[in-house]
């Protein structure tokens, strides 16, 4: 998946988006500044995908900066100098001195880096090979900068086509989305305008395309209805990886080692690199093939064109078509996003949202023609998304006028196709999301600069000291200085970080959690505030109807068996439930519980019949569905009068008690007291309204407005529903709080119910909870009021911190809206101190999350993926729980990716081994069991590769999706996040220490003639590689710790521990070096010959053993372990790797195998000196360990940020 973003219009020379825009753009040439400033305005403000568009014109080959300075100046200058004998050699070309070769090598290196920088950065590529063009009509390419976390910058070709009016139309395609230039009005590139914002009258009266010319124009404008990708071949993907900066840097280092005559080591390192990159490319190709299968498979569909229904392939549909949608015997998926015009559908949206509850879709034929389609508000009820499956449909009534499909399907209008659909958007997230996971780039850069200071000092020392010997080869000396400088940039870093994140992705997938944006995993380790929705997240879906209150005196709850017939009718008819062909009832769990409680039966033709009481059944005619903003739902139903065929129409309404109060013509005097008291006990309360409308004509019934039903109602009771907490909610919330996190509830439910649940779960631990009451009259102030009404306080203008120390705070949607309008600064100060946000609309949930982020808190949001989409998307870590999913898996028989998922044809996948097992004769049972075992082994191996997020696993709602409905998944995400964060931090410490030890040994010791043999370097590299591989595969502990990890790489603890540990190692190395020198024969010459063949010596053997021991000690000391990850003894592969390294060091020190020692160029060490080395190594380890642990105790445990 990592390179999936390469698909699309890449630059011809293979430039790949890796650039990070430092301050905007490359320096302009001779263009005026005013025009440059206008550049980004070529894209509309607020575009979801593209942040800026910059037009460019490609330069002729010889004018490009990758060719001109080198071919036109530097190479000719070098040849001219060579011809003129400037380098000081004779007439023979064979006698080229090293200085000339050095200059030539520097020019070639500069040339290679210049060319490669165009591959690494699109910004650099544009600066080198293109010229900015301020008239888009003259441009040939555009540089497209995406919005944050939406992929990488790309240079894409600018296409020219003829428009409908005969004028030239400029367009480009970025991440499969087409943008066209509006040259007449806006002078901007705009995404293709789909017909999604028109009045309902436009869709209701639409008759599709009447002429072939209209169809051709639409096909030209919108393209085909395909959401597929091309999988690049192996060589193309490998070339992309082989030109990546770190890979090139490693190859450069290998070249330097070859020049320094480390042949075995160089070949070993290069082979490992190539093998690792090749395996990644193979995995990438497998992943891309998987993603490719996710698109919809074309099938025939009925479309109304040229005034008649005709079958066409689903990939030929264009926006504006009228299509027939219905249940398909082949289980075909809906091919695109459509607006339902006529007929009703029940749709399984699991492939898109992950929700297991099928959704009911209503037509817009009877809605107000003047209303404008709002995709955000109307999509849940009237839009059927591409990639979903219609499980049942009710065709339009034959008696009505309008289009009727020949296949008895429902009539729908095509809104969006291809990658522009909701399914296409999810596919694009999987395809073009952030490519590689990296640490904070700025911090990494500062850290490397910090190490570079030491490397420059070491290189300067080598050069100054080395040039004191006039006979010394300056070329070799320069090579050594270059090697020292390269040693501080750890080339393993990107691989290590990728391994750490991939380990977390695999672990989460095994826990039925899927992630579409892996870069968010380290954020989970930094989370400070955890926000939860209440209904369906903290509380269970298995609801209990206690009865109906308000029918008798006080808050007494009447059992459902004793309620009057009007209340029965209101409960039986006011819902959005539907019945499937197999008799299954689908819809909201609360409504299911209510219908079950009153014991009425719903039929397929929208009729309800009582089973427990003797009264007439009801026929539901119109539903005005529940909306979060309105907080109510109403229906128009009818029943037959006794002894007559005349229909008596009724209106039934249910909703929030405070919303319905003004709609009742009569209600009990203690109305507010009743619902308030019951809500305080934690129950969910909905008011019920009813009224008889008498006789209506069919026309009147069809045209009745919502407002006509929702007035002059008779109060028929409060339905009281208990929402029990999920089994593990209490334990999980306690664990999250104990792990130093603040927990907050953000719900659309009643504030009193929310506060009760918050108290049960210990969100609230104060004696009194204050709810902010907005002013009842103009000119008055907001006031805090306790739940029982005993405390009333004015809204403090000062810091809310003092108030929060004494009371728990609850903010309602009304209070939030009032403060937003009157005192936004006070609201921002208040938000971090509030424990419960109640009666908030989805947009307000989003506002709370974005406010917390703006205040600097790393925020997690956990919700149900339908009402909470905005909040989940904006949180640093958004986790969608799937409704009606099991809370836990009892026995895990298969891996998540083996679970039945809908393939592109809609047919359920079956296990290969299951097919093999079916119907085999007894003689074949033996080989089959072996095949099964082999399949299991292969599956287990595949288990360890990064999981591909499939449609149905991922949700369009959030970056993380849990297939289980328990909030235990929050603990899993935080554990994996902390583990990844700590792994990154320890990786930096280890790489920094190894780099510093290497810089010292390559400088001071190098000048003393200490160098390692080729075999020595190879053995050291092999042992290091094993440790690096296994340290990144650490697993988190079972429980979360109170201690928080350090959120950043660059901090006082890390700097001090690296410096102190290096100081201890430095002293040990200097001491042993001097001791070894004292036991060696005295040097005769003044200057050491640095270029003679490697000769084993006591000094070399001592320093080599010491350096190896220090590097292994660095791993053991800096492995973090508890409380964030398993301890060192539990990380078996790393323990074995360190044990092998330790045995190798002991074996080399004791000289137990003389042949082995001589092979690696080690001499026999005197026994008394062996003891000295062992003691120093032990002391070095203990002191470095002590330094790290003391610093960790004082500086290594950050505290949770307390709101001020």
From Swiss-Prot:
Keywords: Acetylation, ATP-binding, Endoplasmic reticulum, Glycoprotein, Magnesium, Membrane, Metal-binding, Nucleotide-binding, Phosphoprotein, Protein transport, Translocase, Transmembrane, Transmembrane helix, Transport. Its main location: endoplasmic reticulum. The active site is at residue 533. The modification Phosphoserine is found at residues 899, 905. GO terms for cellular component: endoplasmic reticulum membrane; membrane. Belongs to the cation transport ATPase (P-type) (TC 3.A.3) family. Type V subfamily. Residues 2-66, 117-243, 465-989, 1033-1051, 1118-1132, 1188-1204 are cytoplasmic. It comes from the Eukaryota. It is a multi-pass membrane protein. It comes from Homo sapiens. Endoplasmic reticulum translocase required to remove mitochondrial transmembrane proteins mistargeted to the endoplasmic reticulum. Acts as a dislocase that mediates the ATP-dependent extraction of mislocalized mitochondrial transmembrane proteins from the endoplasmic reticulum membrane. Specifically binds mitochondrial tail-anchored transmembrane proteins: has an atypically large substrate-binding pocket that recognizes and binds moderately hydrophobic transmembranes with short hydrophilic lumenal domains. The keyword Endoplasmic reticulum applies. Coiled coil: none annotated. PROSITE patterns: ATPASE_E1_E2. Residues 512-541, 727-885, 950-965 are annotated as: P-domain. This is Endoplasmic reticulum transmembrane helix translocase.
